[in-house]
Design a protein with these regions (language model features):
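Short beta-strand segments enriched in hydrophobic/aromatic residues
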Residues: 86, 123, 179-181, 214
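N-terminal secretory signal peptides that target proteins for export/translocation
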Residues: 1-8
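Ligand-recognition surfaces built from glycine- and aromatic
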Residues: 30, 37-54, 91, 109-121, ...
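Cleavable N-terminal signal peptides of Sec/SRP-targeted secreted and luminal proteins
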Residues: 8-33
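Short strand-turn-strand beta-turns centered on an Asx-Gly dipeptide
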Residues: 189-193
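Short tryptophan-centered beta-strand motifs in secreted/extracellular beta-sheet-rich domains
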Residues: 171-180, 186-188
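Secretory/extracellular carbohydrate-interaction modules
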Residues: 64-67, 72-154
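Short, aromatic/His-centered strand-loop micro-motif at the edge of beta-sheets
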Residues: 152-176
Length: 237
């Protein structure tokens, strides 16, 4: 009887493993976050925004100049995977900036209105001392960025300052970053909830970046992030 009971239970056990695996997939994470946003009503940060049409050519990959793209970047089944090593070269020979593998969203630079970046991100444990998302100013601006989201030891931070979200490792999270150009403010949402906002120094124009960009302290030997369903939204005043 015990043996038969054990035999009967194996299908249930296998099904449980399949369900657990599916819940950790990007598609399941997107569905869960979307359902939460619908249930939250006013908690959906994209409400009232219009979706911007993006094409494959809008996603410009920047990676260490001396290695093939395939050795630092992969796009598979709708997921962008970025990784870089602390010993890597900059993304071109004209700069002395830190190593990076990032996407620069091109063709959608902006200078007015309210703009929003949305993406579902994943940072594996061990990755530290890295920026995973930026709002970059125009080339040659006095300040390079108005927002950088850094990861240090599992905590997502505004630059290397205020903590935005703890325990960021090894889970899919929905990130929304809203930039109001006229008001010179940015707000950060995690899984549909506002976690941070601040005033920023205005510039002439802006664009979004995401991936991995090594910072100046507490970096790991290898830095990685994954992204899916990256979307840009905008609205006028």
């Amino acid at each position: 009887m015990g043996f038969m009971a054990m035999m009967v239970s194996w299908p249930a056990i296998a099904a449980a493993f399949i369900v657990a695996a599916s819940l950790s997939s990007p598609a399941a994470m997107r569905a869960s976050a979307a359902a939460a946003a619908r249930g939250g009503g006013g908690n959906n940060p994209t409400a009232g925004f219009a979706k911007v049409d993006l094409t494959g050519g809008d996603f410009q990959v920047q990676r260490p100049y001396d290695v093939p793209e395939s050795r630092r970047f992969r796009y598979r089944d709708g997921v962008w995977t970025f990784w870089v090593y602390d010993s890597d070269k900059p993304f071109n020979t004209a700069t002395h900036t830190n190593p990076r593998t990032e996407v620069r969203l091109r063709g959608h630079d902006y200078s007015s209105g309210v703009w929003q970046f949305e993406g579902y991100g994943y940072v594996p444990s061990g990755t530290s001392g890295v920026s995973v998302m930026q709002i970059h100013n125009e080339e040659g601006a006095e300040h390079a960025t108005i927002l950088m989201l850094h990861v240090y030891d599992g905590v997502l931070r505004f630059y290397d300052g205020p903590a935005i979200e703890s325990n960021i490792y090894d889970r899919w999270f929905r990130l929304n970053v809203v930039h109001d150009v006229k008001a010179s403010t940015v707000a950060v949402y995690i899984d549909g909830k506002q976690k941070f906002s601040t005033n920023v120094i205005p510039s002439e124009s802006y664009y979004f970046k995401f991936g991995v960009y090594m910072q100046h302290r507490d970096w790991s030997n290898c830095m990685e992030s994954q992204w899916t369903n990256v979307t840009v939204y905008t609205k006028s005043y």
